């Protein structure tokens, strides 16, 4: 931080301004929003916004697990058939009733939105047929038994058929198609800036706490902190790790920290072709991709001192990750609780693989997308350089980054994965399964990792209704992936918010930031 920004922050600490009126809430959030079309992209920021306007058929919360959403009840009527009872009092903001027709339409649309680069298709991969039995009854038939169907469709937000069937993403962004049925109603959207909303008095659920909500995008962590301290916003998310200690000492601020599910993960490229981002020490292209050799991947994995990164880079705002799920979650394998740091063995593995002198590698990372990702990448680069792999970090805008990552252009990419379903198969489906767009598998498998044993485990877990048996399958999958170093997990973010002291902030689901998690202290 520069001397000027430090002085500005100090001044803000002293001159913390007054808050907004009690009935209004102003949130400063970090995750960019690609659109307010709730079915365009499976992005964290888009999810957070959508939950204000478009409930799912089943609700998922960090506290309490699954809960009724638009469906009041659901059950298996056969191993491959689910029946959902839809609320009879849910209405859209234009006064028309919410029916099973809207839900059936939404599941079709969510798989085919033009311009999507992060499809929701994986959540519906097991679905063979969706039928409307009557206005309040939806029947979903799956291709095979799928115990995770309710939790998967909790991530797909329902839009109105009578508006959505002719609406484009631009129509949602402009407000033309924003006929909603959530706790808040749409007021306006300024791309790259903010979303304005108001309480929806026709909402079927619990009455919203706030009359009006201003949801403001502030990408820079220091700027978010300054906005809170100056009174421009009432709450911020993803608090800068460097600001936590200062804020905790400020009586005019309350810091809220909870364990998180989101992992920062490195994805090696499994492209068999040589990469321009991997060369010998003289800058000449190699004749093959060294990352295809598991000995090289193991060397990279064991060279990283994750504890040092957690302490020195993240300043305690993360917990070390040794697999994609954190400890004490469904599918975590305690046999892989630690990755020993061993640079000497790493060098020996490189020599054994035919790279005694190492090589050069460029790692790509998006700027201002995942908190501390560029700084973390630089730290990883130092650890790898020490074992002979001279690593350069290239930070690029996310819009550019995601295009290259999706095409597997990069030798090493970085992804922040939310594990939003709270169990291990979500990551298996999206970032580990062999890429198959038609089946909705591997949508975010940017490195194009492919392991038949992992794919087999995913299929078995997806068809197993017995929880202990399903968890055992996921734990076995952890062994498969981590022994093979299909990914290189670094850490799990803690979910950290800061607010005015008269507000209470509780976790919602995954690391989402929504107005519904904020209340006035009684």
State where each predicted segment sits.
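Gram-negative bacterial Sec-dependent N-terminal signal peptides
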Residues: 1-21
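Long beta-strand-rich cores associated with HINT superfamily self-processing modules
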Residues: 349, 497-522
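Glycine-rich and polybasic anion-binding loops at the starts of cofactor/ligand-binding domains
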Residues: 490
């Amino acid at each position: 931080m520069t001397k000027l920004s430090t002085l500005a922050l100090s001044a803000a600490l002293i001159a913390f301004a007054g808050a907004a009126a009690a009935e209004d809430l102003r949130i400063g959030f970090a995750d960019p929003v690609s659109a307010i079309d709730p079915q365009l992209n499976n992005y964290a920021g888009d999810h957070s916004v959508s939950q204000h306007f478009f409930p799912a058929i089943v609700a998922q919360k960090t506290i309490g697990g699954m809960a009724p959403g638009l469906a009041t009840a659901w059950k298996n009527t056969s191993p491959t058939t689910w029946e959902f009872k839809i609320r009879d009092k849910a209405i859209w903001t234009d006064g028309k009733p919410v029916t099973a027709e809207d839900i059936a339409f939404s599941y079709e649309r969510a798989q085919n939105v033009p311009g999507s680069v992060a499809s929701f298709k994986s959540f519906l991969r097991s679905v063979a047929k969706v039928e409307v039995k009557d206005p309040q009854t939806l029947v979903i038939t799956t291709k095979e038994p799928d115990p995770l169907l309710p939790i998967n469709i909790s991530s797909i937000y329902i839009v109105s058929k009578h508006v959505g069937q002719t609406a484009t993403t631009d129509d949602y962004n402009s407000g033309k198609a924003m006929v909603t049925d959530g706790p808040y109603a749409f007021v306006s959207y300024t791309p790259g800036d903010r979303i304005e909303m108001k309480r929806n008095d026709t909402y079927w659920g619990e009455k919203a706490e706030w009359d009006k909500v201003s949801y403001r995008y502030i990408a820079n962590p220091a700027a978010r902190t300054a906005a809170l301290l100056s009174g421009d916003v009432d709450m911020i998310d993803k608090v800068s790790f460097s600001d936590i200690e200062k804020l905790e000492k400020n009586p005019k601020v309350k810091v809220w920290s909870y364990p998180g599910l989101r992992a920062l993960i490195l994805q090696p490229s499994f492209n068999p072709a040589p990469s321009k981002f991997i060369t010998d020490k003289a800058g000449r292209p190699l004749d093959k991709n060294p990352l295809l050799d598991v000995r090289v991947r193991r060397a990279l994995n064991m060279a990283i001192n994750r504890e040092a990164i957690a302490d020195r880079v993240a300043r305690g705002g993360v917990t070390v990750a040794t697999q994609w799920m954190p400890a004490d979650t469904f599918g975590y394998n305690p046999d892989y609780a630690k990755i020993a740091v061993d640079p000497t063995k790493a060098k020996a593995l490189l020599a054994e693989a035919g790279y005694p002198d190492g090589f050069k590698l460029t790692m790509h990372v998006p700027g201002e997308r995942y908190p501390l990702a560029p700084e973390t990448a630089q730290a990883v680069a130092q650890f790898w350089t020490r074992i002979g792999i001279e690593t350069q970090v290239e930070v690029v805008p996310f819009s550019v980054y995601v295009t290259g990552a999706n095409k597997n252009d990069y030798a090493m990419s970085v992804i922040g994965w939310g594990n939003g379903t709270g169990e291990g198969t979500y990551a298996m489906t999206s970032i580990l399964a062999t890429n198959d767009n038609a089946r909705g598998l591997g949508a975010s498998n940017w490195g194009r990792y492919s392991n038949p044993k992992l794919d087999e485990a995913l299929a078995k877990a997806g068809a197993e209704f017995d929880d202990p048996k399903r968890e055992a399958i996921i734990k076995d999958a952890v062994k498969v992936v981590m022994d093979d170093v299909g990914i290189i997990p670094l850490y799990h973010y803690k979910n950290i918010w800061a607010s005015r002291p008269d507000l209470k902030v509780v976790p919602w689901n995954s690391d989402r930031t929504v107005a519904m998690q904020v209340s006035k202290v009684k």
